[in-house]
From Swiss-Prot:
InterPro entries: MNE1 (IPR025694). One of its GO terms (cellular component) is ribonucleoprotein complex. The gene is MNE1. This is Protein MNE1. Present with 861 molecules/cell in log phase SD medium. One of its GO terms (biological process) is mitochondrial mRNA processing. It holds the Pfam family MNE1.
Amino acid sequence: MKLLFKRYSSSHIGKLIKDSLITPEILPQLGRQPSSHKRLPNNKRTNSITDKWLKDALTRKDKLNEDKLQNVNLRLNVVLTTLQKLRTSDNPALYFALLNRIGTGHIKWLNKSGRQIDAFPPDRLPLEFYHELSNMLYKLSLRSANDKIALAKFSLQLLDRYYFLKTKSLTIEGKFRANIKFLRNCTLLIVKSQSNYYLRAIQRLFAENSEGQLLANLSQLAFYVETSQWTSMLDILSSCVPDSGLRGSKERERAIQLLELFSPCLVKSLKVMIAQNMENEACQILRSLSEWNFHFDQHDSSNLIQLSQNHSCLKVIETMNGLSSTTAVTRQFGLEKLPTDVSLKQSIHILSKDNFEPLKQDSFLQFLSFKLSDLPLNLEVWKKHIKEVDDQMQAESNLHSLRAFFIDMLLCHLSVRKDFDFMLSLVEHIVYEKNLWQPLLLTDNIVGNKENSTFHCLFHGASQDISTKLTLLALYNQLNEIGYQFTSHDFLSMLKVCKNYSDSDFFYFAFYNLLVTQSHKFFLFDKFSDKFSWRLPIQIGDAISEWLSSLEIDIQENTDRVLQITDDVGEWYVENKPFKSEKGTIQPINIMELRKIFGERKTLFHMDSEIFQKSKAKRDKEMRNEALFTANDAEYNFAADVSYAKRVENLFSYIRSKQMQQK
């Protein structure tokens, strides 16, 4: 099983590389260890896994020495393929162990046809290994680890050494061009450090080696995107898509490749422009990219089109349709011809007139929620606005489904833009005063909205406030009683509010219920390795990592416990492969088996308000015994949490009573 959250011990990325990758050819500043130094713990064993891989790469006449590689012929493509598989299977320890082994020997490298590769100084690794290593370092940088500065330093040293070997290579001077994917990887490693100092350093290396202004501009764009400097990003964007007629054929081809490699930054820039209603500017960038024969992949294209529909940027959709062989469906139930300043009430009027049915028709009308942004942070103003829109809907259609659509749009907007108290107050107004509890329940049936309906919005809104642990517990218990279909995002919201050791029992309660209901969705088939694997989603792994890193006591104990749980659950799925034969669906792990994995005496499998308060008091006492106090303790408001939780319980009690009255 591949873990997506880091282990808080001595296995940080920077230390892993320093311990394993002590190869002067790659990192000359670390120096070569004495010959008596045993680099690998298993290098005395002739049957170690690295020995096996190297034997696969040997020519028939060579033999592998158990301690060192001396004067052997290895096939480059076989070793590279092994490294690529280790990278893809997320095994950095063995990856660097193998790279270290080949870097400390005297090897003659052979190409696929068996001829020696001699276009680089003797006893130096071929440049292909630099390209491959940059891919691995970039993959490591995607983790939520505290090693991004270390990776940035490594990438600078790697690039500097790469250019040095380039000048010393036997390739004819002037014809050698650096691998642009390697340059992109090094750039993004630097960018992820968010250090302007390292950015300037890599740009100087590019300038000294005549890599061209476009690469420097794209690296600057990537830096602005990573650091969310949107104004600066917009200023430099046009220079990243220059006049396509100014280049020769080779330079043009290289520029197109660079643009494609940096396409995530370009896509993010376009998304910012669309969100800011910079429609004309976005269209100009799209037209400039088309002159370079640049094409977005289907995923990015779909996301840009949907975002444009959400923000009613119809010119962008038309431009993308003109540049693409496929055409997006842009009809918005009569809204496509409306000016952007049309009010929400006018939009609802058109939807009602066109008999829009959100429970049957899929739509891209989320952009209407942006028309709520102008309302001030005043509860009475919002209540008045809700009344006006609802009165209009009652007069024109009185359809519960259209009112459900309006409520869902309203709460999705509130969950990300207002505090939880404000959001909960409006929900209470909708249920108690407006008597719209039926449309509220219907939001779960809106087409294409299964994972973003009202109650999921409540989970997300509550997770934005640190004083909502008991509130989220109450919300979960109330919905669990009626058999509600939770998503992994609901449990992510519960994990996010865990901020310190006092939250331990609540954390394991949420983690357990996540695995009860969602773990079968994390069991996937890896096409590359041709095997099944089980892994936690990245966001879940990040939330777990954040909680583990915030613990004041028992850090190692909890880290080991979480790792053991995920290991055991993953092993259960991989070993049992619990498929239902009739449909090919995956059977969730047995609850009794999962409880055994968590530990019956260690975990609270049932938790209500009283149990929560007792468990928190117990953990608080353990903290006081250690004389520990954190900023998170001061931020958490228990009284507010109790109040929110009671209001949530009252809401559900009221809705249940209304349902009983109608039976």
